[in-house]
A protein has these predicted regions:
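Mature extracytoplasmic enzyme cores
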Residues: 1-176
Length: 176
């Protein structure tokens, strides 16, 4: 699988305020974060500071020529992967296991479920964005001026590739 799990968007800089971008006709400030990291430097410890910028849509990856480029990535900031695995392991039925999978905290992976009741279920559980536009791929940014230009949700869970109780009675998978 090679799903498209992220998109690069080009936002217009507010010409009157260089640390703001224009979205939905409003000037919105970029969020600045200074990160300090201590590291070993010979016998001592040094500290290095870096400045990062972000928007609610995703982190800024580049700024130039009146544009702010951001990357919007599936599951960015979602740290519930461990919780999802725990819920999967504790599931006592296919319905409970599917509920755990609906968390979509695992960005991409194939999963197999089987139980004593004879259920065998295969699922590619990707957090694939439902793009409202053709993807820019890895080579071009998609212009974003309003919410309708930006992906805001994933492809529905029940639309993901899956197979329940295969006709042959088993599943062979070398991708999990």
């Amino acid at each position: 699988n090679a799903p498209d799990l992220e998109e690069i968007y080009a936002l217009d800089v507010d010409p009157a305020r260089p640390d703001h971008y224009l979205f939905e006709g409003t000037s919105i400030p970029l969020q600045q974060e200074i990160v300090q990291v201590a590291y070993k430097n010979g016998a001592g410890v040094s500290t290095e500071s870096r400045e990062f910028w972000r928007t609610p849509l995703g982190p800024v990856i580049y700024r130039d020529n009146g544009k702010v480029y951001i990357v919007r990535a599936a599951a960015d900031g979602d740290y519930r992967g461990g919780e999802q695995f725990l819920r999967m392991m504790r599931a006592t039925s296919l319905a409970e296991w599917k509920d755990a999978m609906r968390m979509r905290a695992r960005v991409t992976s194939s999963f197999t479920y089987a139980d004593r009741a004879g259920n065998i279920f295969y699922l590619w559980n990707g957090s694939a964005p439902a793009f409202p536009h053709p993807s820019g791929g890895d080579t071009s940014a998609v212009p974003a001026h309003r919410t309708a230009d930006v992906w805001t949700h994933y492809v529905p869970f029940d639309s993901l590739p899956h197979l329940l109780i295969p006709p042959g009675g088993y599943i062979h998978n070398e991708n999990s």
